[in-house]
Amino acid sequence: MQAMRDVQAPSGRFTDIAPVGGGFGGVLWGSAGIVVPWEAYLQYRDAGLLEQHYPAMAAYIDYLESTIDPKTGLSSDAQLGDWLGPQNNALGSAFLATAYHAYDLGIMAQAAELLGRSADAEKYKAMYEKRKAFFNRVFVNADKKTLGLIGGRGMFGGRGRPGATPPPPPEFKLADTQTSYAVGLGMGLFSDENIPFMVNNLADTVARENKDDGGVLRPKYSLMTGFIGTAWISKALSDHGLRDLAYRLLQNNQYPSWLYPIDQGATTIWERLNGYTVENGFGGNNSMNSFNHYSFGAVGYWLMAYSLGIQRGEPGFQKFILQPEPDPTGQMTFAEGYYDSMYGRIRSAWRVGGKTLTYSATVPANTTATLYLPAATPAAVKESGRPAGEAPGVKFLRHESGRAVYQLESGSFLFTVPVI
């Protein structure tokens, strides 16, 4: 964050690259200056970085506000959009820039409140609600589908070649894409009235065939998201009861998908999912491709927080949640992993064999976990062969929404329960 502050422009704009500056990603890249210090606080419960970086965050918000066209309400700092997404051109960048502007404001309201800046917290909360209302008003049509601002100078702007015919002005068009629904749902930006429609729309975009920007029809359960949408799609699916689709999306191996590069020999995460293919070699796609790039690896968060179910209960993980989500499609029969928290290793593992779900977990010393285990009834849950509620370090809390809920003290546990 120090490097980002070192190259922050006098306008308040964060550059895409630090510490050397430069770049053209706009709001979608610059928002790292807001999101990273907030996520660092949530992960480690250390407000020091947030306090130190807060003036730079506030300056960036002032910059974002200065980019708003008073006539349209849209930001002029929106370039790359859903970079390398198969339907990037179908959505455009204005939708995502507006979403991230609102998301940044929501974070600022929480950060200001945490740091005791009450006046700032109220100001940013009001700004957030205003931007969220604008987002729903402008980017959701009467049919409860999302819209994108399409056309104009393109993602890099500019005047074009001398004598060239200027492009038509941008216009709002239907943008019925995975990214639009995933981002709006994942960030919590859609209004309560719009949410049910957007959930159905997201499910439809995942389960159907979709045409990419080149007009090629891609198979069902293809990953039609780019750098921005990929970070939100699996979370949005699981949060809204569509974990079967999240797993189908995960396990598809046809292009575009997470597993496609693996079938082409990938041992790292590529910037382009087809940066190299067995059939065509590099095929020109390596002209702008990193073979060690984070963005499509954002699914790792979902694997940790949803498949394994390791989630923060409070900042810092002294209290955390274990909420495993076994694969309802039956294709994936086990998962195991861990997170090394400040208090020690949090381990979570599930396996489905026949009609039995086996779940094991490790809770570090000086922490407690709340376990949500899929179970038709609490009486069916066993820990090391005995009724779970009678096991040392296990306290039954309630049964809700098809899950038995327990509080776990530090220790290692082995649960079994019939599959529901």
Annotate the PLM regions:
Residues V138-A142, F172-M288:
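Extracellular polysaccharide-recognition and catalytic grooves
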Residues D244-I420:
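Non-catalytic C-terminal accessory modules of carbohydrate-active enzymes
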Residues G92-L96, K220-Y221, S290-F291:
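A short glycine-threonine-serine/GTX helix/turn-capping micro-motif
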Residues A32-V35, Q52-A59, L96-Q110, A119, ...:
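Generic recognition of stable, solvent-exposed alpha-helical segments in well-folded globular domains
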